[in-house]
């Protein structure tokens, strides 16, 4: 199946195996974005700058590098971040009745990791003056010192994303951000990301794993698409359309079927093509049936 592997890889790039890592990230950088420079002066004193930078990349958790912790509005407990809360409070080890997730936009209080002062959500600690997150989103209540992620806030999605705003666009019909390479080529599916992955059932819109947009417009985790490939599954789990260019595979199947004698010359069946939607009446074959319109073997009897 080497040829199919190459085809799937090529299609994944063409159809936006863009990183749609949809976790909330930065709207504002106090230290670099002049548009939001309400808390800095024209000439920053070297001592003040040194204070802002104190402890950068030294605090945080497995999910974020940040210099604060959050108080969860739902259970009033303190966690390093929203994910840390959800991993603890939404675990299978917790009573199902008590499981819950933290509503990111409702966080009101943060605790400075350097001085321990609890305060309302803000970028600079009111007590010690340290910047608690080089990138800060007041809407998503997100703090992150790792600016290499190229965080940006999408008003359409209502959350922040990573990868650089210039590399993505928001599709109003699909209801999510896609790679700019898909702007004029993707198939729109209403609410394409607002559902669970058809393989692992994780909610795609808030998933921290990479998501791929299939030619049919449906979405799936990249890792799940790879697992499908490993098991020789090349049809969308939702609509059954081919997930990549299968023309070479169909040509090979033509050659193989030509060597197999057919003992049902007089039997005809009607088929529906999963790729183009056309119906055909073709000679019955034990192995596969070919669409008379698009020549695909991705068909079913009707």
Curated annotation (Swiss-Prot):
It comes from the Eukaryota. The gene is RZFP34. Zn(2+) 5 binds at residues 154, 157, 170, 177. A zinc finger (CTCHY-type) spans 132-196. Zn(2+) 2 binds at residues 74-75, 85, 100. One of its GO terms (cellular component) is nucleus. Zn(2+) 6 binds at residues 171, 174, 186, 188. Keywords: Metal-binding, Nucleus, Stress response, Transferase, Ubl conjugation pathway, Zinc, Zinc-finger. This is Probable E3 ubiquitin-protein ligase RZFP34. A zinc finger (CHY-type) spans 54-130.
């Amino acid at each position: 199946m080497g040829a199919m592997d190459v085809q799937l890889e090529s299609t994944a790039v063409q159809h936006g195996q863009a990183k749609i890592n949809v976790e909330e990230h930065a709207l504002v950088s106090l230290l670099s974005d002049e548009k939001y420079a309400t808390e800095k002066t024209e000439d920053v004193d070297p001592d003040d700058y040194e204070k802002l930078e104190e402890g950068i990349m030294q605090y945080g958790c497995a999910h974020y590098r940040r210099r604060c912790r959050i108080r969860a509005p739902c259970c009033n407990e303190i966690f390093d971040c929203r994910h840390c809360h959800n991993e603890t409070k939404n675990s299978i080890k917790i009573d199902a009745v008590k499981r819950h997730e933290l509503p990111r936009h409702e966080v009101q209080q943060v605790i400075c990791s350097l001085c321990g002062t609890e305060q309302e959500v803000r970028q600079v600690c009111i007590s010690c003056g340290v910047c608690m997150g080089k990138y800060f989103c007041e809407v998503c209540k997100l703090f992150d010192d790792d600016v290499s992620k190229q965080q940006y806030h999408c008003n359409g999605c209502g959350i922040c994303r990573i990868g650089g705003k210039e590399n993505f666009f928001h599709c109003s019909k699909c209801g999510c951000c896609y790679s700019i390479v898909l702007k004029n080529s993707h198939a729109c599916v209403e609410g394409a990301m607002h559902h669970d992955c058809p393989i692992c059932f994780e909610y795609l819109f808030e998933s921290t794993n990479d998501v791929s947009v299939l030619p049919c417009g449906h979405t799936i985790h990249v890792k799940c698409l790879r697992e499908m490939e490993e098991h020789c599954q090349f049809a969308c789990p939702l609509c059954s359309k081919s997930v990549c260019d299968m023309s070479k595979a169909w040509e090979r199947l033509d050659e193989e079927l030509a060597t197999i004698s057919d003992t049902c010359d007089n039997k005809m069946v009607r088929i529906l093509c999963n790729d183009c939607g056309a119906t055909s009446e073709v000679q019955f074959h034990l192995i596969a049936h070919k669409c008379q319109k698009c020549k695909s073997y991705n068909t079913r009897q009707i």
